[in-house]
Amino acid sequence: MGILTLLLGPALITVSGEQPGSTEKWTAPAAEARKKNPVAVSESSLAAGQKIYMKRCVACHGKTGNGDGPDAADLGIHPAKLSDGLIRGQTDGELFWKITVGKKPMPNYVSRLSPTDRWNVINYLRSLVRR
């Protein structure tokens, strides 16, 4: 049973950073949390962020960020609901760090997206919460 737990444990971690039945949070380092988004919110930033989101994130997080994408059911956990205010309490720096480093089953995007692309995605995510 111990080996099975070790093998399956990482798969039980939710995208929001909590483990089922745990109070452990996925927390960005303080220095990362203080980072400011250098990309101003604009039509072009939102459009770029939406395009990336629809290509890279929608399969799990869903079109409106509700965690109901077509691949969500196959993950074994429920993807974070990005539209329900989960991100409202997090700084842009925290979100940037989480997108950059990832946490299974969410991949890291350190080499998949440029820093500007990651900031554009954050601007787009913020627009989902405002809807």
Segments and roles (model prediction):
Residues 2-11:
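Bacterial N-terminal signal peptides
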Residues 14-19:
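Boundary of Sec targeting at the N-terminus
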Residues 21-52:
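Electrostatic cytochrome c docking/interface patches
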Residues 38-39, 64, 81, 105-108:
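Conserved beta-strand positions that form and line the central face of beta-propeller blades
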Residues 43-66, 72, 95-101:
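Sequence/structural segment immediately N-terminal to covalent heme-attachment motifs in c-type
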Residues 66-67, 115:
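Short, non-ligating residues that shape and space the ligands of small metal-coordination modules
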Residues 77-94, 109-118:
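Electron-transfer interface patches adjacent to heme c in soluble/periplasmic c-type cytochromes
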Residues 97-104, 110-131:
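C-terminal capping alpha-helices of c-type cytochrome domains
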